[in-house]
Amino acid sequence: MLEKLVDSLWKICRKSKFQHMTPIADAVDTFCFEPLHTPSSPPFVRDAVDVKRWMMLVVIALMPTIFAAVWNSGLQALVYQSSDPRIMEAFLHISGFKSYFSFVSQEIGIGSVLFAGCKIFLPLLFISYAVGGTCEVLFAIIRKHKIAEGLLVTGMLYPLILPPTIPYWMAALGIAFGVVMGKELFGGTGMNILNPALTGRAFLFFTFPAKMSGDVWVGSNPSRIKESLATMSSLAEKSHFDGFSQSTCLQVLNSTPPSVKRVHIDAIASNILNLEHVPTQDVLQTQFATWAESYPGLTVDQLSLEQLQNFVTTPITEGGLGLLPAHFDSACSLTEAVYGIGKFSTGNLFFGNILGSLGETSTVACLLGAGLLLLTGIASWRTMLSFGLSAFFFAWFFKIMSILTTGNAGAWAPAKFFIPAYRHLCIGGLAFGLVFMATDPVSSPAMKLAKWLYGAFIGFLTILIRLINPAYPEGVMLAILLGNVFAPLFDNIALKQYRQRRI
């Protein structure tokens, strides 16, 4: 029956007045069945895996990430808009799989989570395919060429890199810009130098920054979430710096001023975690000995919240740590991010129980997709490995240089440099970008050496933007797009090296 419908569509399009619609019939035929057309020029390769099957493997690799996006966005939305501080407290203090699924089943409901997540993700997916597909069809008709299968993956990647609160009209504008300016402008699928999905996101990021960063990570109605958070903080009698918020780990990292030093977060951590020894213990003890002369009987790791704030914000000349009082809340938030406390625990970051763009939250889901892409040979392991190693190395490098240049175990170096290197791999969009964006075969280099250089370049830029640039909390998007621009240069370098070895 399906074959008859496709044949009927071909008959209609072969009529003279509908011949310009032939690309649509060809696209439907190719999607449903094995394409009948053969290459018009060499090489002629007979293979069961054509471009359509190749793209379908990428779609299958995206399935774990899509499920994680639906599940996490639905759960976060229901918890954050509940206006119930008891539910929020229970959610933030989850530890382990057993307590996690017990909380979901007893407090929220699995069906409710999936339904809420689908309400957020599926409309964005539909818009991506509808608007992006329309642009593809129009250009195919105008240029009189076949509709390529590239949108099958681009249309699925695009909504996964958007915040859940993005307005629908804005999502449509972004995918249209990405397809037209990022791909069709260069000649269509296979000739674009930039990743179309990232091009669309970059356009939205620079055109509508307030809708792409800040408090945009929960539910589909930011105003409702803000009201719910304010209600929960009020009912729970939370202070201004320990109230409920929807800040992400990268937002905390980016918004922390340079005046927050390592010694400040170590002082807070020693009281929250009851650590017997922190890296800056000697500096803490020296300063505390002077400060505690007015408070006999106190120890540096057994302070009340008021005493801790007093010690950290007292001027250095009086025995304190010299932090501006207005920055104490930032220091508390960064302490959680650096030491993996509460919602920023390593488990939450790895498995995806965090806030962020729809597809970037779950590192383990991205790794499952990476396994399939590597197993089938679709993605380059060289790009993935060099990207990950480069990001890890430079995160570690900034930490070591901070210690060496300031002394005292980096006590007076900016605290943001001391987030563990492995945690950089689990926060933001690094895992998603590493697996699905940087490995785009069209916009990435082709030579083996070039792939190593390309991945290392992206990893370096990602960490540099995260830690040094105060304007952008995340560096993955810009790093990959810049890597796309430099990809021909990396190929040229690799080609010269290859020729020199052959001579």
Curated annotation (Swiss-Prot):
Its main location: membrane. One of its GO terms (biological process) is respiratory electron transport chain. Its EC number is 7.2.1.1. It catalyses: a ubiquinone + n Na(+)(in) + NADH + H(+) = a ubiquinol + n Na(+)(out) + NAD(+). GO terms for molecular function: FMN binding; oxidoreductase activity, acting on NAD(P)H, quinone or similar compound as acceptor. GO terms for cellular component: plasma membrane. The chain crosses the membrane at residues 55-75, 120-142, 160-180, 361-381, 384-404, 417-437, 452-472, 475-495. Its cofactor is FMN. It is an enzyme of class 7 (translocase). The keyword Ion transport applies. It is found in: Cell inner membrane. Belongs to the NqrB/RnfD family. This is Na(+)-translocating NADH-quinone reductase subunit B.
